[in-house]
A protein has these predicted regions:
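Bacterial N-terminal signal peptides
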Residues: 8-17
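Bacterial N-terminal signal peptides that target proteins for export
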Residues: 1-9
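Boundary at the C-terminal end of the N-terminal hydrophobic targeting segment
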Residues: 20-25
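N-terminal targeting signals for Sec/Tat export/insertion, comprising classic cleavable signal peptides
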Residues: 30-60
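Peptidyl-prolyl cis-trans isomerase
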Residues: 26-27, 33, 58-215
Length: 215
């Protein structure tokens, strides 16, 4: 009984935790349990803000929650494998690449302001995403093989039509080969990761509570 009280008390505190924003009360609550860990509504809100910042839009809450469950799986496997955190210089390079996706430094700052993320939040979340993607890359890239036929097909169906749409001269196949190969490798990594995540998730105890007692 004492052990049960010790376990339940922290959960009770989490369930009734309240943050005040302006005149509104936002109740932070448990929205999922994965094995012995929990995911909070505030975790959904934070990842959604990062999506808004990095991509210009965020997914619905249920999709964000599923991403958080997937991230739990990847992070747990990476930790078990003692996979190293990204180096500071790798985080800086990733941040520089992200900044280049914006038309100007002003647009970057404006989007960050709209998302409500602080500089520290942004770097922390970027580092977390980089850690997960690095692990998936290391896990699946060695087994992926891309043949010449796949490269030529991608060139004919994706590269050439896209250039023509923009009224540009398409690059030669040879000059685009490395870019195409990496694009196909990334697509294959995503496919293998999706398959692995579905298989891994089926073996875990996952409970979703997002739509229960919603405000």
């Amino acid at each position: 009984m004492k052990r049960m009280l010790q376990v339940c008390l922290p959960l009770l505190i989490l369930l009734i935790a309240v943050r005040v924003v302006g005149a509104q009360e936002i109740i932070d609550r448990i929205v999922a349990r994965v094995e012995n860990d929990i995911i909070l509504l505030s975790d959904i809100r934070e990842l959604a803000r990062y999506q808004l910042f990095a991509e210009g839009k965020s997914e619905p809450d249920d999709q964000v929650l599923n991403r958080l469950v997937d991230q739990w799986i990847v992070r747990n496997e990476a930790k078990l494998a003692l996979f190293p955190q990204p180096k500071p210089e790798d985080v800086e390079r990733s941040l520089a690449r992200l900044k280049r996706t914006f038309s100007s430094p002003e647009e970057f700052e404006e989007r960050k302001k709209q998302s409500g993320l602080s500089d520290d939040d942004m770097v922390r979340l970027l580092k977390s995403q980089l850690y997960l993607s690095n692990y998936l890359d290391t896990r699946f890239r060695p087994s992926i093989q891309i043949d010449d036929n796949a490269i030529e097909e991608f060139y004919k169906t994706r590269v050439v039509p896209r250039a023509e749409q923009r009224k540009q001269t398409p690059p030669t196949l040879d000059s685009a080969r490395d870019f195409i190969q990496e694009a196909l490798v990334q697509r294959a990594i995503n496919q293998e990761a999706d398959k692995w995540l579905k298989e891994s998730r089926s073996r875990l105890h996952v409970q979703l509570f997002l739509n229960e007692n919603s405000q």
